[in-house]
Amino acid sequence: MIHFILLFSRQGKLRLQKWYTTLPDKERKKITRDIIQTVLSRGHRTSSFIDWKELKLVYKRYASLYFCCAIENQDNELLTLEIVHRYVELLDKYFGNVCELDIIFNFEKAYFILDEFIIGGEIQETSKKTAVKAIEDSDMLQETMEEYMNKPTF
């Protein structure tokens, strides 16, 4: 099970966070700071897996963003890397070569895509095609609602 997902920049700025375990806000901030510092201090040629407290951290850098997941010790690290890669593929499909600015200015869409893909720390939808279709359907529904709300009533 994934306990949380963090996306942060090379400068250490948190861009997205999703927690699947309940923790107090103060503890979340401390954990986030600690993980960002730990990951950023590692060399580029080191392993993408870190034993951290009672969890394992699995991270991958894409362009200027780090995608980091905390998983249980018995979970498969390579499968988690594939989950991260699939999330990046979904973001790429939606935004067209996603970058940090896409996450910053469209964070609600990034969260929506993540929620369409992972629920409760477990993978929800393995099919990229099905996930993209659900995202496109949601966009179409939102556009239809906006058009409907903008029509004058007589």
Swiss-Prot record:
Pfam family, one: Clat_adaptor_s
Keywords, alphabetical: Coated pit, Cytoplasmic vesicle, Golgi apparatus, Membrane, Protein transport, Transport
Subunit structure as annotated in this protein's UniProt entry: Adaptor protein complex 1 (AP-1) is a heterotetramer composed of two large adaptins (gamma-type subunit AP1G1 and beta-type subunit AP1B1), a medium adaptin (mu-type subunit AP1M1 or AP1M2) and a small adaptin (sigma-type subunit AP1S1 or AP1S2 or AP1S3).
Entry's localization field: Golgi apparatus; Cytoplasmic vesicle membrane; Membrane, Clathrin-coated pit
A Gene Ontology molecular function term of the record: clathrin adaptor activity
Protein name: AP-1 complex subunit sigma-3
InterPro entries, sorted: AP1_sigma, AP_complex_ssu, AP_mu_sigma_su, Clathrin_sm-chain_CS, Longin-like_dom_sf
Lineage: superkingdom: Eukaryota
Its biological purpose: Subunit of clathrin-associated adaptor protein complex 1 that plays a role in protein sorting in the late-Golgi/trans-Golgi network (TGN) and/or endosomes. The AP complexes mediate both the recruitment of clathrin to membranes and the recognition of sorting signals within the cytosolic tails of transmembrane cargo molecules. Involved in TLR3 trafficking.
A single BP term in Gene Ontology: protein targeting
Similarity comment: family membership: Belongs to the adaptor complexes small subunit family.
Any one GO CC term of the record: AP-1 adaptor complex
Membrane topology: Peripheral membrane protein
